[in-house]
Amino acid sequence: MGSFEGKTVLITGAGRAVLSDGKCGLIGYGIATAFAKEGANLVLTGRNVSKLESAKKELEEKYNVKVLILQADINDKNDNEAAVCHVMDEIKKTFGRLDVLIDNAQASASGVPLKDNTTEQLNLALYSGLYATFYYRKHAYPLLKETKGSVINFASGAGLFGNYGQCAYAAAKEGIRGLSRVAANEWAKDGINVNIICPLAWTSQLEKFQQAYPDAFKANVHVPPRGHVGDSEREIGRVCVQIASPDFKYRTGETITLEGGMGLRP
């Protein structure tokens, strides 16, 4: 029996993508796979319906769990609050409970210096990341309070260390960290713990970049002290499973770097 059997986990940005070796090629899908192996029922949201459908098919067939998929695109033109409320309504109708919320979705324009950033580029990062986290957090709270659940949010070394060309992305991710610490403080009394992960994972985007531009990849992508870039399921998803488990309920409001030693900081 898996440790999350009978429980429900919501993961944003969890469409299916795989690497050339068949391993999970996106962080969200790696997390979904890790929880499916523990018997959790899953709610997966994202913009790309075909990737969500592919994830549902794969996870249900392999792990005998129930997967609810919902298209949700948080941007500066949609009624975002209504979209998130719809997600919560569907969770209540389908599963009747929510035990873990994982805000993973994020879009951004990378490599643009601050002086050249546009309002549109800033909005892309803020709405898909910070605003999405705010709305999901706000409307998941009643369900999480009932189960004394867990929240895991994703930030980045780009925000911690001010990476060049990551103005909008870093702003969104540091906003998410601040929002998460406030939630950890306010919701501790309800038995809800909230933590933040800063990951470094080998994704299908990185693999394609390496294949198409090997010289640029070598110059710009640095291997951490551990000697490899993290595995989305084994080294990111499995940590999410642990952080969301009862054994880690006392840990809240913390930023956890999963960067193989690259994110060393005081």
What would you call each of these model-derived segments?
Residues 74, 214-234:
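Catalytic Tyr-x(3-8)-Lys segment
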Residues 87, 112-114, 118-123, 217-220:
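Substrate-binding pocket helix/loop in short-chain dehydrogenase/reductase
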Residues 137, 172, 180:
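Active-site helix of classical SDR
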Residues 188, 193, 251-253:
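Short, small/polar-rich loop/turn modules that mediate ligand/substrate recognition or access, typified
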Residues 156:
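Residue(s) in the substrate-gating loop at a strand-loop-helix junction
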Residues 99, 115-134, 152, 176:
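Catalytic Tyr-X3-Lys loop
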Residues 20, 111, 161, 222-223, ...:
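Short C-terminal tail/terminal secondary-structure segment
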Residues 2-42:
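Canonical Rossmann dinucleotide-binding motif of NAD(H)/NADP(H)-dependent dehydrogenases/reductases
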